[in-house]
């Protein structure tokens, strides 16, 4: 008797779905890069929720989450099959970041400073990006994932506070009349990020990133970032946001359907610069007591100019009364590592900035402003804050790394399109 052909198709449908997802993971670097970037946000949130809880083998929640997320990223990275070559721009960028990590971790060991186990994930993460470079669209997707994770944990922390499950911390009083006239006196919001001076620049990143995107992403990220800037009342974030917007206007020939006039492209950064210097000269010449801290840090750096004094040296200055207890970091992108890691650390950091700057400039000349805008925003943050612990791939480090990666990816794509 002849065989009757089966007409039901579920197995084939299932197999086609599996093939679709498998092929998608093989063709795009977005999944693994999104996992790398989003994990640092989730780890930060876990540490906020359970700051003293020991979860596994003596390790706190944030460390455990970081390793789990890294493991997921490794699996996704293994499935990815890139078709692009590894361009020179990526080599310089990844090499500069790796050198900075080696210097800062090595000097931390020399000084006897403590650091957690997630520091060892930085070099493997950089190697993953170097060995299997994501495409430019994949990097934008990863940036969206990172930004969305920031928004979600900010909302979650506020909901937990409303529910009485996890009380938010506030630092000082908010100085925005526009806000306090409506709500009455309220504290400066730090959310799950540990400090208002960390929360504010995260808001600035969200605003700038949102302006670089479109549709619902633009609306969500700009709105969320603006709210965070307002409630955290961080002057640094206001400056960095203004700088990012000014650079976007200056380097982008078009803003959506609007063609940017040359006069506006020149006037925007000039106006921000004049406003900043006017504010410093007339209203706040000490940058909210930053300049006295800088003087002490520079004085202490001279005791060990090459390798710095480390975190232990900063704590010794606090114990001796030379520094106040709140000044446990240098409140400047270069002054803090100068005292902490000496000339070795600062030179390594400047190398990262220079390489990222060259890449961003070349990308801007070829028509993509994202790299230059993000880099300018991050550097403006560093005028009165040092947001990044260079031994980790943390929440504050990702925007700066992303700035360089976007530019390097665009240079690769532009070169490929020319050939």
Predicted regions and their residues:
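Hydrophobic transmembrane alpha-helices and their immediate junctions
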Residues: 3, 14, 259, 343-379, ...
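Interfacial transmembrane-helix termini
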Residues: 45-68, 83-90, 99-123, 137-138, ...
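Transmembrane alpha-helical segments and their membrane-water interfaces
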Residues: 75-80, 104-159, 352, 380
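Long extracytoplasmic/lumenal interhelical loops at the membrane interface
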Residues: 281-341, 356, 360-363
């Amino acid at each position: 008797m002849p065989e009757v052909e089966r007409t039901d198709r579920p197995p084939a449908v299932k197999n086609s779905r599996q093939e679709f997802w498998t092929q998608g993971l093989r063709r795009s670097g977005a999944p693994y890069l999104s996992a790398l970037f989003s994990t640092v946000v989730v780890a930060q949130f876990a540490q906020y929720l359970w700051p003293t809880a020991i979860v596994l083998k003596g390790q706190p929640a944030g460390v455990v989450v970081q390793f789990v997320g890294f493991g997921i990223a490794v699996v996704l990275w293994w499935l990815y099959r890139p078709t692009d070559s590894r361009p020179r721009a990526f080599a310089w960028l990844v090499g500069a970041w790796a050198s900075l990590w080696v210097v800062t971790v090595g000097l931390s060991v020399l000084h006897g400073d403590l650091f957690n186990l997630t520091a060892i994930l930085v070099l493997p993460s950089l190697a993953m990006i170097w060995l299997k470079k994501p495409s430019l669209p994949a990097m934008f997707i990863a940036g969206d994932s990172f930004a969305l994770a920031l928004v979600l944990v900010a909302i979650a922390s506020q909901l937990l506070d409303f529910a009485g499950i996890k009380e938010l911390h506030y630092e000082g009083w908010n100085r925005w009349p526009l806000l306090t006239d409506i709500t009455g006196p309220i504290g400066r919001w730090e959310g799950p990020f540990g400090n208002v001076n960390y929360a504010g620049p995260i808001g600035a990143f969200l605003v700038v990133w949102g302006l670089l995107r479109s549709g619902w992403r633009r609306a969500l990220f700009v709105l969320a970032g603006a709210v965070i800037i307002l409630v955290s009342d961080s002057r640094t974030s206001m400056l960095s946001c203004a700088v990012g917007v000014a650079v976007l206007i200056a380097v982008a020939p078009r803003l959506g359907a609007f063609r940017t006039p040359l006069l506006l492209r020149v006037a925007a950064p000039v106006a921000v610069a004049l406003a900043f210097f006017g504010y410093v000269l007339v209203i706040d010449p000490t940058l909210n007591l930053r300049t006295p801290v800088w003087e002490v840090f520079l004085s202490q750096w001279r005791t060990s100019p090459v390798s710095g004094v480390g975190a232990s040296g900063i704590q010794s200055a606090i114990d001796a009364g030379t520094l106040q207890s709140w000044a446990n970091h240098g409140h400047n992108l270069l002054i803090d590592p100068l005292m902490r890691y000496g000339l070795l650390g600062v030179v390594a950091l400047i190398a990262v900035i220079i390489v990222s700057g060259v890449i961003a400039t070349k990308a801007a000349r070829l028509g993509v402003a994202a790299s230059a805008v993000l880099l300018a925003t991050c550097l403006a943050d560093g005028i009165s804050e040092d947001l990044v612990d260079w031994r980790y791939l943390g929440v504050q480090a990702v925007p700066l790394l992303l700035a360089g990666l976007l530019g390097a990816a665009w240079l690769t794509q532009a070169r490929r399109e020319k050939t």
